[in-house]
Amino acid sequence: MMENSTTEARNEATMHLDEMTVEEALITMNKEDQQVPLAVRKAIPQLTKVIKKTIAQYKKGGRLIYIGAGTSGRLGVLDAAECVPTFNTDPHEIIGIIAGGQHAMTMAVEGAEDHKKLAEEDLKNIDLTSKDVVIGIAASGKTPYVIGGLTFANTIGATTVSISCNEHAVISEIAQYPVEVKVGPEVLTGSTRLKSGTAQKLILNMISTITMVGVGKVYDNLMIDVKATNQKLIDRSVRIIQEICAITYDEAMALYQVSEHDVKVATVMGMCGISKEEATRRLLNNGDIVKRAIRDRQP
């Protein structure tokens, strides 16, 4: 008898997984995976509240902090790391914390998730403040490490969010903004790296992306604040300027170089026919929002 938890229950559709052909197993997994985005869709009302609050706190100087263990922790670290090149965020603005530290990204750290106090220490080490948003991620909804992190964050006055894949989760009782996504039993019983992990990844994609849209790091659907750390991203940066300003690639490259590789500044320069200094001033006066800076005609 498995425990009364959806993520630990046996999946009736895969009771004979070991007897299926490779193709049958693939078709079954694919069918199960199709349930995930539909389950996430049901959580949009809760996610809307989470993202609006996160945008507000970010604008006040708060940080977005993910905390979790195992797969959940790794997904948080991954999302935080990707925000740096995608949105040119400071590594200290969006942070992923995993039980057991960085070593746990590639190796299992035995027992790390079982200690509530460890999460408190990890949050103290980054000087958690009341401006921050702490998102606790746990498929089961009852991981002690995440419980400890959210509990401590509440005492600091930080905004707390929980993401779980079970209904009536323990962490939902602790967080100010609980999000529960019921994806059903896993293809492989209890292996929450599967449907639960997919759901968590989709949710983190939504939270970070739409938050960054809300703070002005996107123009239309373009990565206007992209940080070019390699040749591919340099080329993308120039093409973004080219696309928005409707100019040639070479003209866009010239703006990119004059702006000292700042896509936002280069775009405002190109759209308004102004100097780097004037473009910088307009962005500063308009909350770093490119469209507002372009419309700004004040001397």
Swiss-Prot record:
Q: Which InterPro entries match?
A: Etherase_MurQ, Glucokinase_regulatory_CS, MURQ/GCKR, Reg_chr_condens, SIS_dom, SIS_dom_sf
The EC number of this protein is 4.2.1.126
- Catalytic residues at 82, 113
A Gene Ontology biological process noted in the UniProt record is: N-acetylmuramic acid catabolic process
Query: In which pathway is this protein known to take part?
Result: Amino-sugar metabolism; N-acetylmuramate degradation
Q: Reaction(s) catalyzed by this protein? A: N-acetyl-D-muramate 6-phosphate + H2O = N-acetyl-D-glucosamine 6-phosphate + (R)-lactate
Q: Which class of enzymes does this protein belong to?
A: lyase
Q: Name one GO molecular function term.
A: carbohydrate derivative binding
Tell me which Pfam families the record gives.
GKRP_SIS_N
Segments forming domain SIS: 54-217
Keywords per UniProt: Carbohydrate metabolism, Lyase
- Which family would the database say this protein is a member of? Belongs to the GCKR-like family. MurNAc-6-P etherase subfamily.
Q: Tell me the subunit arrangement.
A: Homodimer.
Extract the HAMAP family matched here.
Answer: MurQ (MF_00068)
What does the function comment of this entry state? Specifically catalyzes the cleavage of the D-lactyl ether substituent of MurNAc 6-phosphate, producing GlcNAc 6-phosphate and D-lactate.
Q: What else is known?
A: A lyase-type mechanism (elimination/hydration) is suggested for the cleavage of the lactyl ether bond of MurNAc 6-phosphate, with the formation of an alpha,beta-unsaturated aldehyde intermediate with (E)-stereochemistry, followed by the syn addition of water to give product.
Q: What is this protein called?
A: N-acetylmuramic acid 6-phosphate etherase
Specify the species. Staphylococcus aureus (strain NCTC 8325 / PS 47)
Report the gene name: murQ
